[in-house]
């Protein structure tokens, strides 16, 4: 058993009795998990958190009396516990979920809008895996932490479109949205590279997330579209349910999207993006693997290093989930292991080194 020889206790919060039953059946089907209680709205959720002291809470976003966001604020302030949001596949649901991640939720699971029981059963493995990972999250990440982000007033002048000669390829999963929102404001407007970002998210959520990132960043951020030219000072977020790759067309780096089979159980996956970026940009590629479960991005790091690029991984102390960075580091192909707050400056330095024609070589530095 994962927690001192006992089962992981889960509180299920949803206004739909049917949804609560579906989630309870899924959770109780795993020998390491048990539902310790249930609640129909945010007010009941706060009472039940105090009563059954769960290890993890699954929290519906939209509920009567008190919604999931308001309940989350109270729970994180009074009884810090890992929370996984259960979100409807709507624009409102996606926007609220991004806010919830900023407020301290660890992760989210999309709630399909039709044929709920069939779709949720398909999500069984994902739900169980996310609950188990959430239960392991260190307590230092559990607090009400509305990320203080200022909406950036971007220069109104139209920036010239310059095809990127350097690519920064970033992979992130669980804990990624919160972490990326902290570092993207630090990238300079005149970054002489294009950023390619794969954040594991379903359709709809990536668009909301790209808009949120754009609102706090000096660089332009958008959800990637088929045929986008990768340009300097711009970031492209892989859309949910599509792999994002890079190819050369008429001498320019161009984004292509496809629905090839899932890799590591996800689509988009970071590996195909990073591998094709390395093929197109060669030694002018910077690879970054951030917080997340699994090992997506590790193969991408290997291919970037083989081409002579520069590779970076987030350290364990600042990773909400250390799975992906750990897998990347274990390849032996990571140049820099740095805390979250040092990622932007390390990326900027790497871009400067590439522009100057230098090479970092094997400088593995683990920052405590």
From Swiss-Prot:
GO terms for molecular function: phosphorelay response regulator activity; protein-glutamate methylesterase activity; protein-glutamine glutaminase activity. Phosphorylated by CheA. Phosphorylation of the N-terminal regulatory domain activates the methylesterase activity. GO terms for biological process: chemotaxis. It catalyses: [protein]-L-glutamate 5-O-methyl ester + H2O = L-glutamyl-[protein] + methanol + H(+); L-glutaminyl-[protein] + H2O = L-glutamyl-[protein] + NH4(+). It is found in: Cytoplasm. The active site is at 173, 200, 296. PANTHER family: PROTEIN-GLUTAMATE METHYLESTERASE/PROTEIN-GLUTAMINE GLUTAMINASE, PROTEIN-GLUTAMATE METHYLESTERASE_PROTEIN-GLUTAMINE GLUTAMINASE. Contains a C-terminal catalytic domain, and an N-terminal region which modulates catalytic activity. This is Protein-glutamate methylesterase/protein-glutamine glutaminase. It comes from Pyrococcus horikoshii (strain ATCC 700860 / DSM 12428 / JCM 9974 / NBRC 100139 / OT-3).
């Amino acid at each position: 058993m994962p927690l001192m020889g006992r089962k992981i206790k889960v509180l299920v919060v949803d206004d739909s009795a049917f949804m609560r039953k579906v989630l309870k059946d899924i959770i109780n089907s795993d020998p390491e998990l048990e539902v310790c209680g249930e609640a129909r709205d945010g007010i009941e959720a706060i009472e039940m958190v105090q009563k059954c002291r769960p290890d993890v809470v699954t929290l519906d976003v939209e509920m009567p009396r008190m919604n999931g966001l308001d309940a989350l604020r109270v729970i994180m302030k009074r009884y810090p516990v890992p929370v996984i949001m259960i979100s409807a596949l709507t624009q409102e649901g996606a926007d609220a979920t991004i806010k919830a991640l900023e407020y301290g939720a660890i992760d989210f699971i999309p709630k399909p809008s039709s044929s709920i029981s069939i779709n949720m059963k398909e999500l069984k493995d994902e739900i169980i895996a996310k609950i188990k990972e959430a239960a392991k999250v260190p307590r230092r990440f559990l607090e009400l932490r509305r990320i203080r982000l200022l909406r950036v007033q971007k220069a109104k002048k139209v920036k010239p479109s310059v095809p990127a000669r350097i690519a920064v390829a970033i992979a992130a999963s669980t804990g990624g949205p919160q972490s990326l929102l902290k570092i993207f404001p630090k990238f300079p407007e005149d970054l002489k590279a294009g950023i390619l970002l794969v954040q594991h998210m379903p359709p709809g959520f990536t668009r909301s997330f790209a808009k949120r990132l754009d609102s706090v960043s000096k660089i332009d951020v958008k959800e990637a579209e088929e045929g986008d030219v990768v340009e300097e000072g711009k970031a492209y977020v892989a859309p949910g349910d599509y792999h994002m790759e890079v190819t050369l067309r008429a001498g320019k780096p161009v984004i292509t999207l496809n629905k090839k089979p899932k890799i590591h159980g996800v689509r988009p996956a970071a590996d195909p993006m990073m591998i094709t970026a390395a093929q197109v940009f060669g030694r002018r590629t910077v690879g970054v693997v951030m917080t997340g479960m699994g090992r997506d991005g590790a193969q991408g790091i290997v291919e970037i290093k083989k081409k002579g690029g520069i590779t970076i991984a987030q350290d364990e102390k600042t990773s909400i989930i250390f799975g992906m960075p750990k897998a990347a580091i274990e390849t032996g192909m990571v140049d820099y292991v740095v805390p979250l707050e040092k990622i932007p400056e390390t990326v900027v330095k790497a871009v400067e080194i590439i522009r100057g024609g230098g090479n970092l070589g094997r400088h593995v530095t683990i920052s405590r």
